[in-house]
């Protein structure tokens, strides 16, 4: 988004929910699936030392809980009705099965494909400026955080690259100067967001004001009016009311190039343009020159605050229409907050295909948030595919 930062106080805690959020009056996406208890990665790939692959759903859903080495289970998951998945799959396997393959996949906490065995991210050590790639414990598994801990002992480290797992080489690096902020953005402290997933210690990406990542020259990302699906797992307890904590499709020149030149997932409680119900934070779509909760800047009563520690936020972009979905990344299914026409002046879209994280398309860097995982796909995912991805996220065991 390219307008100047709006008002709104920073919220850094104290807004946790104890269950999944549903939109007041909002309908669950058709083709979606209900909560079935928990999800086990039944038959997930087991690594040396008893590590189970991160997340994974079975055909028709699975029961139980996804078990990590500590025996923690993910509660209240969902089944992916109509989408064929197999144990050990990641979100990108599920999107591919739904004919909407990932063209970018970023995470510092886990592999997003069942067979992925490469590096998740790179850290740079402050003491001598050397770098280290951080991989996974096993194919399709969690980050090998012990590698980072050893490398960064006695000094500090920043996350210098978040690697693209899709094979398209759309790696996120330090965001360069842009129209709104004429200097590069800061890189995240590699140890600032430590937590556990299914008993494994991992590190997310903590992005205070002034921090951000970007890649302008990409391969396979949607341009013009091409359809796409984008989601990120973020935090409902660390956000603010400024522009713009985004993940997704943006301008390639780091400037505001007008309405429709972006399509990114926004999360926060900025109210200068669109907004949802209550005080936020909300899932919205940043389409440049406008952050929208529906087809106008009017408040959308069906877009509720999502205040759980881990939030799934999704935007589905089609020719002439877009959809917003979201939910608790620890439990339950996604809820549809909006599915309808684009705002006036946004048809057709003029997407350019860069990827941003934590900032606006013109490098506005006054927002804040946390990032754990996210993807961009080629094509608009079905509701059933979206729900199967959510089930996989729940199964990964965020915070367990």
Where are these regions (language model features)?
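Extracellular glycan-interaction patches encoded by glycine-rich segments
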Residues: 347-371, 380
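Short, hydrophobic/proline-enriched secondary-structure or compact coil segments at domain edges
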Residues: 115-129, 203-205, 232, 281-283, ...
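Extracellular glycan-recognition modules
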Residues: 159, 167-307, 319-321, 331-344, ...
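GGW-centered surface loops in extracellular recognition modules
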Residues: 84-182, 224, 231, 393-400
């Amino acid at each position: 988004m390219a307008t100047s930062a709006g008002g709104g106080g920073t919220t850094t805690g104290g807004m946790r929910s104890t269950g999944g959020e549903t939109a007041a009056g909002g309908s669950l996406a058709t083709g979606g699936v209900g909560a079935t208890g928990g999800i086990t990665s039944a038959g997930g790939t087991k690594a040396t030392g008893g590590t189970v692959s991160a997340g994974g759903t079975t055909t028709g859903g699975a029961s139980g809980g996804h078990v990590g080495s500590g025996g923690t289970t993910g509660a209240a998951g969902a089944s992916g009705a109509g989408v064929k998945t197999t144990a050990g799959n990641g979100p990108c396997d599920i999107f591919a099965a739904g004919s909407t393959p990932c063209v970018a996949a970023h995470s510092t906490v886990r592999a997003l494909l069942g067979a992925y065995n490469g590096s998740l991210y790179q850290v740079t050590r402050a003491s001598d400026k050397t770098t280290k790639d951080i991989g996974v414990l096993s194919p399709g598994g969690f980050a090998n955080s012990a590698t980072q801990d050893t490398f960064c002992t006695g000094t500090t480290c920043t996350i210098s690259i978040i690697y693209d797992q899709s094979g398209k080489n759309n790696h996120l690096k330090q965001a360069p100067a842009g129209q709104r902020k004429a200097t590069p953005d800061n890189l995240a402290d590699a140890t600032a967001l430590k937590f556990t997933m299914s008993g494994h210690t991992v590190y997310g990406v903590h992005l205070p004001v002034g921090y951000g990542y970007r890649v302008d020259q990409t391969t396979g990302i949607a341009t013009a009016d091409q359809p796409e699906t984008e989601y990120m797992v973020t935090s409902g307890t660390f956000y603010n009311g400024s522009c713009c904590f985004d993940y997704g499709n943006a301008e390639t020149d780091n400037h505001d190039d007008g309405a429709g030149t972006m399509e990114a997932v926004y999360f926060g409680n900025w109210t200068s343009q669109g907004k949802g119900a209550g005080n936020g934070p909300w899932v919205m779509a940043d389409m440049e020159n406008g952050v929208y909760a529906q087809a106008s800047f009017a408040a959308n009563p069906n877009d509720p605050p999502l205040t759980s520690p881990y939030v799934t936020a999704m935007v589905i972009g089609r020719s002439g229409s877009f959809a917003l979905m979201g939910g608790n990344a620890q439990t339950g299914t996604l809820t549809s907050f909006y599915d309808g026409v684009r705002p006036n002046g946004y048809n057709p879209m003029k997407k350019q295909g860069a990827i941003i994280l934590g900032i606006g398309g013109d490098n506005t860097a006054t927002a804040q948030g946390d990032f754990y995982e996210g993807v961009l796909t080629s094509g608009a995912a079905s509701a059933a595919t979206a729900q199967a991805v959510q089930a996989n996220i729940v199964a990964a065991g965020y915070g367990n």
